[in-house]
């Protein structure tokens, strides 16, 4: 038979806006994931901090955030790591009538060992074909400066999708 390598995650984020004039919001998040390629049996992240809405309107967004987070990671080898990391990110979004582009980039160094860091980038382009039909292509990259044994330091995913809007 064919062996498949599974991956999955869930992410929940809460934002509280302090008011339009300040352009700051408080956010808290938690995430759980597994990833056979990266040898992650279970990873749980939780954190909270501030986001600065540098620019935001219907067609343009630029957000910058920085949040300390706790990371629990159990590898498929049974090794368990518990670390505190700083999760800093930049999100950029631009939309035109039939085109959207979004990128969000995270830099996450371990607070006690700064040379152990992760960088991830999630990028998508969305084109309107018809008023109810869109084509989406996305590229996700993850770089780990200290990956587990036999795991590549750079992992990427490329996806194409059709989006129906009713």
Protein language model features and the residues they cover:
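Residue-level signature of outer-membrane beta-barrel architecture
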Residues: 16-18, 32, 52-54, 70, ...
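Solvent-exposed loop/turn segments connecting transmembrane beta-strands
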Residues: 1-5, 34-42, 76-82, 110-118, ...
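Repeated loop/turn-to-beta-strand initiation elements of outer-membrane beta-barrel proteins
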Residues: 19-26, 58-62, 93-101, 127, ...
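Transmembrane beta-barrel strands of outer-membrane/channel proteins
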Residues: 28-32, 48, 64-70, 103-109, ...
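Membrane-embedded beta-strands of outer-membrane beta-barrel proteins
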Residues: 10-14, 48, 88-90, 121-123, ...
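Transmembrane beta-barrel domains of bacterial outer-membrane proteins
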Residues: 1-13, 28-37, 120-126, 138
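Outer-membrane beta-barrel "beta-signal"
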Residues: 154-166
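Hydrophobic, well-structured mid-protein blocks that either form specific transmembrane helices
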Residues: 35-79
């Amino acid at each position: 038979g064919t062996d498949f390598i599974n991956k999955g995650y869930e992410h929940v984020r809460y934002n509280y806006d302090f008011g339009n004039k300040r352009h700051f919001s408080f956010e808290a998040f938690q995430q759980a994931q597994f990833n056979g390629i990266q040898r992650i049996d279970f990873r749980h992240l939780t954190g909270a901090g501030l986001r600065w809405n540098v620019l935001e309107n219907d067609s343009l967004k630029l957000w910058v955030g920085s949040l300390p987070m706790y990371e629990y990671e159990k590898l498929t080898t049974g090794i368990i790591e518990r670390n505190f990391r700083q999760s800093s990110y930049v999100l950029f979004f631009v939309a035109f009538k039939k085109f959207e582009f979004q990128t969000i980039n995270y830099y996450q160094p371990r607070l006690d060992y700064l040379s152990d860091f992760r960088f991830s980038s999630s990028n998508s382009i969305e084109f309107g074909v018809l008023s109810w039909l869109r084509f989406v292509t996305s590229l996700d990259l993850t770089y780990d400066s200290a990956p587990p044994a036999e795991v590549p330091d750079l992992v990427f995913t490329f996806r194409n999708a059709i989006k129906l809007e009713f």
